[in-house]
Amino acid sequence: SENFVGVCSKNHRFANKTILPDDIFTEHLFLREKGSGTRNILEQVLSEHNRTTGHFARVTCINHFTLMSELIADNLGITFAYEVMQKSYSSLAPFYVKGWNIVRDFNYVYLDSADSLEILEAFDNLSE
C-alpha cells in the first residue's frame, strides 16, 4: 500500500503542509488521461466530498508524468499521485488535505524482461 498525496513545487505555499480541502480548488490541477489509476482515485475522493475536478480554477490533462512534474516544479499547478512518485522528483514536495487519508495499493505493470525487472527493482528501492 502507498499513500496518495497532493504534489506541488517545493516553492509552493502548500509544500509539506496540511491544508483545508477548499484551498485546493483555487489551484491549477494537472491530471493524467481518462482511465488512469491516479485520476480515478482523485475523482473518487472528490466525489466522496461532493466535488469534481470541475471545481478547480483550471484543469489540464497531461499524459506524461515527467512533463507534468516539470510544470509542477515550475510552480504552475498541482496534482495528486502516489507518494513514491513524488519522492522520485527532488523538485517536488507533498502536501496533505485535512480529512483525506488516502492509501491505495500501488501495482507495477512492466514488460517481462531482465532489463524491465532491473529497472523495477531500482524504482522499488526508491520507496524504501
Give each language-model segment a name.
Residues F95-E128:
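A late-sequence structural motif
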